[in-house]
Amino acid sequence: MATRLEEHLACLYAPTPQHPEAWIPAGVVAGLGADVCDRIGLRLHQALAEPVRHLVDAGGRRWRPGLVAEAIEVLGGDSERYGPMCAALELAHTGSLMVDDVQDDSPLRRGLPTAHGVFGVATALNAGTNAYFAMDRAIRMTLADDPLLGGALRDAFLAALRSAHAGQALDITGHHTEMEHAVATGDARQVLELVRLSHRLKSGAMPAAGFEFAALLTGAGEDLRQALVAFGEAVGTAYQITDDVADLTGVTHHGNSTKQVGEDVRNGKVTMPLAHAVTRLPADRLRDLWDVVRTPTASEQERADVRSALLDCGAATVCAQEADALLHRAWDRLEAVLPRSPRVQRLRDMAWRTVHGRTVA
């Protein structure tokens, strides 16, 4: 699947300019001369494809399409037939990273300057959101003769996009009120609930949709479909929890940093380790850390001290345990209804590596 996935990505987002109808509905440019279409195709490629390819070509783990393809195979389907949709899931994720990097003013992604740093904010935002529409093209390419199934897949995908945007909205607005309450009272329940919900929506919804795709494409029964969706959500949520931890130590690939260390602390975010630290640090120490996190002018040394404290108090360990517990619960439910297949263990191993084998997003 890995090699073919790159081919499917290139089919949806070609590395060279295409006819304008790769991007806009057929007939819109009818009657225009070939030279005009060539110029339009070049401009659309520069404004829509190149910013996305910048991030796609930088690598990434491709775990979302990989897991969905493996789930399709476990269920007796042919993942290669649905390769374009698996690729479109990766493109949607890539687009969300581009938008997220603008919102966080991140300088680095996958070891390269972020898309907005290279192409500008306006282009990165437009190209990033345009990547969501690759799924519609992929469904048309794959299921042109099955509008009912295509409609069900679009419903699942759009529901995931709505959830992801709601999660991002919660992430942007932050959980400062709840964190302030936790610091004042020592009660972390509210802030933990909101951080968990944000993670489920922002990071769990799209993998859940991918696993729902696997169920729909293979005609799985309702119990199995629900278990697949729950497992996909668990994998995505657990991945985000461990990503919160990875932000404290940095993420490297072949010895190079793939993104800036401590971005969450620098951006004043309330993360899972910070929320779990409420019950693991003395009240005065917690107050000092929280004051640094919410102060935009805090020094790099102060921020480094926050990261060290969150690691030393055991909050990061608790996050890893929570991620594992999520995975185990969802897997136990799924395994009980999966068909017998030698690929079942492979699916499980891939999920655990996804969550705990941190390299690049």
Where is each model-derived feature located?
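A glycine/threonine-rich phosphate-anchoring loop and its flanking beta-alpha core
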Residues: 118-119, 129-145, 155, 178
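Proline-centered turn/helix-capping motifs that create local helix->coil transitions or kinks
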Residues: 13, 17-21, 161-174, 280-286, ...
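All-alpha helical catalytic cores of prenyl diphosphate-utilizing isoprenoid enzymes
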Residues: 34-42, 57-61, 126, 144-252
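Hydrophobic faces of stable alpha-helices that mediate helix-helix packing
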Residues: 2, 6, 64-65, 92, ...
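Alpha-helical phosphate/pyrophosphate-handling elements in metalloenzyme active cores
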Residues: 37-88, 134, 138-139, 192-235, ...
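A glycine-biased, small/acidic residue-tolerant capping/turn segment at secondary-structure junctions
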Residues: 107, 246-256, 286-293, 345, ...
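Conserved N-terminal diphosphate/IPP-binding helix and adjacent helical/loop segment
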Residues: 1-94, 98, 102-117, 171-189, ...
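Divalent-cation-assisted or electrostatically stabilized phosphate/pyrophosphate-binding catalytic cores
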Residues: 109-130, 181-202, 226-230, 252-280, ...
